[in-house]
Amino acid sequence: MASQGTKRSYEQMETGGERQNATEIRASVGGMVGGIGRFYIQMCTELKLSDYEGRLIQNSITIERMVLSAFDERRNKYLEEHPSAGKDPKKTGGPIYRRRDGKWMRELILYDKEEIRRIWRQANNGEDATAGLTHLMIWHSNLNDATYQRTRALVRTGMDPRMCSLMQGSTLPRRSGAAGAAVKGVGTMVMELIRMIKRGINDRNFWRGENGRRTRIAYERMCNILKGKFQTAAQRAMMDQVRESRNPGNAEIEDLIFLARSALILRGSVAHKSCLPACVYGLVVASGYDFEREGYSLVGIDPFRLLQNSQVFSLIRPNENPAHKSQLVWMACHSAAFEDLRVSSFIRGTRVVPRGQLSTRGVQIASNENMETMDSSTLELRSKYWAIRTRSGGNTNQQRASAGQISVQPTFSVQRNLPFERATIMAAFTGNTEGRTSDMRTEIIRMMESARPEDVSFQGRGVFELSDEKATNPVVPSFDMSNEGSYFFGDNAEEYDN
């Protein structure tokens, strides 16, 4: 966005800071990832993990989940008040994988949440370091975005499964704060709002009384977050209507679904940040690097540089392709699940294939999977170029939004056209233009019809060599303009289930 007036950058959101200059932001983000690294090293010591085991992404995820669970106040309170059989509300744990006699073994560990909180605070100068926790949540969310499809969730709320490119951050927990809200896609916000409205329709007391007042405040806040993602006046005006509705019901659901569809062409601004697994930060801290002193950014060259020199391993199931597993994790690390495959492939320097062609399941291993046949391999997370992550939807100029494509929400600020099948998208817009939002709907449809698939977005923006840390010589790639690349076409991945 050109107007950086009152907006805080995402690093500021990420670190909970007020307005800071670039150096202060780099230092506080550095402090945040440094804290994650120190925590990870300490956990590896506690668990007596070997160097190799500490670089295993599955172990990293277990350790990350433990600290997130230890700080989940709401759930902890709930567990204490509703004791369930065999679940100790004061403990947290998960599978840790160890190498024994040339084989991988699974060991289930349990820790006091209090102990985990102590280690985390100790690694973060005695503070709760909520920003670091949110950072881990966003990494898990990015991994889910790359791994699972949300078709069922979309259909349940009355949306079209082809709108999956709008679903970034759909598995983020509610407590992920401003940094979490920034990375949520338009579809994710719409889905949260629809669920809320549906509860209100079914439960007479949802909007009533003291609780109802809090619910109403949450509803309006979510509406404002979504409004802030839209870049055209008509879309924003429609959001005002939805927010101000006295008694939100089916009319509002209709409006929200209309807005979600419109976002396929008039794209919303959704932040992208490269959040890496804790073990990567741990490796770097262990090598003596001082993140806080050197500074760090989630949207520049830094994450690329870290991945360039970090060796991370993953468990591999018998019929999985290690190269495909690497692609999945690479996409998750750069929050590129909804990026155009042409752009991702160019940056990565190897062809990034659509998910329907991947021979790999998710990164996490279920507790009933057989460890006897598990192997491990190095994840190839390096890239050929780096590019700046974007916060815009790639609309060509501020007011008139540009072409979009079913299934692209740009991650990298790199010049390209955003091809789309206008007929497919516009077919969804027949019918209802009456009612109180008719003029806005008409205006939105008019803008969508005038969008051209050959329009170039991010004009003049290119990728950079990894040696070019100041981003002085952009390499502007040329893409085959006709051939769009969406990760989710012809998809057969499994659903995300909590």
Curated annotation (Swiss-Prot):
Keywords assigned: Capsid protein, Helical capsid protein, Host nucleus, Host-virus interaction, Ribonucleoprotein, RNA-binding, Viral nucleoprotein, Viral penetration into host nucleus, Virion, Virus entry into host cell
Gene source species: Influenza A virus (strain A/Swine/Germany/2/1981 H1N1)
Post-translational changes noted in the entry: Late in virus-infected cells, may be cleaved from a 56-kDa protein to a 53-kDa protein by a cellular caspase. This cleavage might be a marker for the onset of apoptosis in infected cells or have a specific function in virus host interaction.
GO biological process, one term: symbiont entry into host cell
Domain of life: Viruses
Family stated for the protein in its record: Belongs to the influenza viruses nucleoprotein family.
Quaternary state and interactors: Homomultimerizes to form the nucleocapsid. May bind host exportin-1/XPO1. Binds to viral genomic RNA. Protein-RNA contacts are mediated by a combination of electrostatic interactions between positively charged residues and the phosphate backbone and planar interactions between aromatic side chains and bases.
Source species taxonomy: Viruses, Riboviria, Orthornavirae, Negarnaviricota, Polyploviricotina
Protein name from the UniProt record: Nucleoprotein
Chain location of the short sequence motif Unconventional nuclear localization signal per the record: 1-18
Stretches the record annotates as Disordered: 1-21
UniProt subcellular location: Virion; Host nucleus
Main location: virion
Role according to the record: Encapsidates the negative strand viral RNA, protecting it from nucleases. The encapsidated genomic RNA is termed the ribonucleoprotein (RNP) and serves as template for transcription and replication. The RNP needs to be localized in the host nucleus to start an infectious cycle, but is too large to diffuse through the nuclear pore complex. NP comprises at least 2 nuclear localization signals that are responsible for the active RNP import into the nucleus through cellular importin alpha/beta pathway.
Molecular-function annotations in GO: RNA binding; structural molecule activity
